Amino acid sequence: MPKGGVARRATKIRAIRSETQNPVLLLDAGDTLFGQMLALQSEGRVIIEAMSAMGYDAMAVGQMDLAKGVDVLLARAKEARFPILSCNLVNAQEQKPIFQPYALLERGGVRFALLGVTEPAALEAPGVRDVAQVLDPVATVKKYLAELKGQSDVLIVLSHLGVEGDRALAQALPEIDLIVGGKSRRVMSAPDIVGSTVITQMGYDGEWLGRLDVTLDAQGQVRDPQSTVIELGPDVADDAELKALADSHKERFAQPTTEPAK
């Protein structure tokens, strides 16, 4: 039986939130919207609706999120109840970010800055090269770090650069506290530590949910990162609300049956 699904994911997310009094951030590093036929048929609406219902805080733009073009993803971003982030995917003519570059939020008295960064291969998505450019990730993130200085206690980068790109980013910009990565499809049972930057990544196709517990010391530094791999297998019960949402989209896009010849 296949793994994954938004209904199982929602069950685990609810459980995590119910068992802790600590702030919980729900984040996604991209390549999220078009991995399944239903997502393609709905132009990503089913995934955006599900993520909004689950209370996601932010996601980054990955190459596959642009599979239907920039305009479709912009439309989904307007519908989402969370920001879709990329600081370095810019309008080809004005050199301004196409999507929101970062988000600021506060949980439990802690100020978080969330910054999205997209891989150069995003230009290979249909029609993207005609309207957009991808700026150098390190230089662009560095520019925004200067802008965010003093506005946050914890700086998190949602990165679709891949593991090696994440490591290069951490080496160049040690002020980054945490990188939540995508693209490389790694299931990281333990975080990668580069200097003082914590790097994590959790698989592909929504088959796993990654949990990373961290402690903030008196100086606001991330300490003692503990990673948990949560497999969304058939033993995980479906959340009723998310199952109903997914089923409603399945019914809408179901192929009509062919009447037998008489």
Regions found by a protein language model. Give the residues of each.
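Acidic, metal/ion-coordinating pockets
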Residues: 1-262
